[in-house]
């Protein structure tokens, strides 16, 4: 099992808007077949840490890649991405972890 995280660094004062947009992303991911998608808000972190995190689980990398491909090719995602870019100080970074239980 894998968990994918997208880290978002927001423009000051825009974290609330980013979280609303990430909830829209969550809905799009679920439509694309994603599981356990959720939005995390940074409560306390070291300097330079992301302000918001989008997280989703996938059983394997192939499934994750298929979901990402399906999502990013949609017009809805393209419009969403354009809106999001004005709320961020930098492009989001993706991290993929193996869940080791």
Sequence positions of predicted segments:
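Short, surface-exposed ligand-recognition loops at beta-strand->loop->(often short) alpha-helix junctions
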Residues: 9-20
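Residues that cap or initiate secondary-structure elements
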Residues: 12-14, 60-62, 100
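Intrinsically disordered, low-complexity segments enriched in polar/charged residues with Gly/Pro
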Residues: 14-15, 42-44, 83-84
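Short, low-order "capping/linker" segments at domain edges
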Residues: 95-101
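Absolute protein N-terminus
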Residues: 1-2, 101
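An amphipathic, aromatic/His-enriched active-site/gating alpha helix that lines ligand/cofactor pockets
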Residues: 20-38, 57-94
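Short, well-ordered beta-strand segments in beta-rich or mixed alpha/beta enzyme
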Residues: 2-9, 38-72
